[in-house]
């Protein structure tokens, strides 16, 4: 698999950051004092290799997530920058942690001593960028209608990105060239739900029929279906998400370095999910979670 080098990762951040984001980074870190913000933003956009280091700066975290006047800059920050800062903050916090709480119910937490594995996951700049992009993509989760041919006649069907069964149903009707993208997004949804809304994933566990349909969509051999449909909800979502990412990678017509990160996360899906649990608990929900509406029951 190809790997993303520092320049490619930096460019990935630059693709998402607004000029206001870049001005915020320059202002808070004082990396670029002169000339004024527009020129500072242009300089950073032309030197994106500096962006990950600036996003990880503790002063930027305080400017975005700090209390009161410290967070005055937060109104300038895009959702992508906010999530990127949260991901880098998690990497910093995990450096001094030996255990990370795992949710055992709406209010319950049990300590799991897997912090070294989570540190290793966030040790990759490409995986940090992946998580920031994933979170930002769900601030505008898609929904609407798509066209399907039913009994030889075109029909309009409604869909929501968070409805895994309906999204998987599109695999039967879309052109073959579109299927890798749907598999990728199915994996994204499984990771997002178990990472940010694990209580919802447990409370709305898949029934045997839906689980079997999704296992079939994930190209899981039928002999494994019975065992997997009775697995705990989070375990099943983890299995499906990793499987969908692998199928997306295997079907991709061009295997780029950016897509290779998807295959990499497939092998570390549980660590990715646990990192998102930590980010949600420490950064997103304590601030009131203005970014994500809870999934509909």
Where do the protein language model's features map onto the residues?
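Long, non-catalytic protein-protein interaction scaffolds
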Residues: 1-266
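Helix-rich, well-folded core regions that mediate interactions or catalysis
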Residues: 287, 293-297
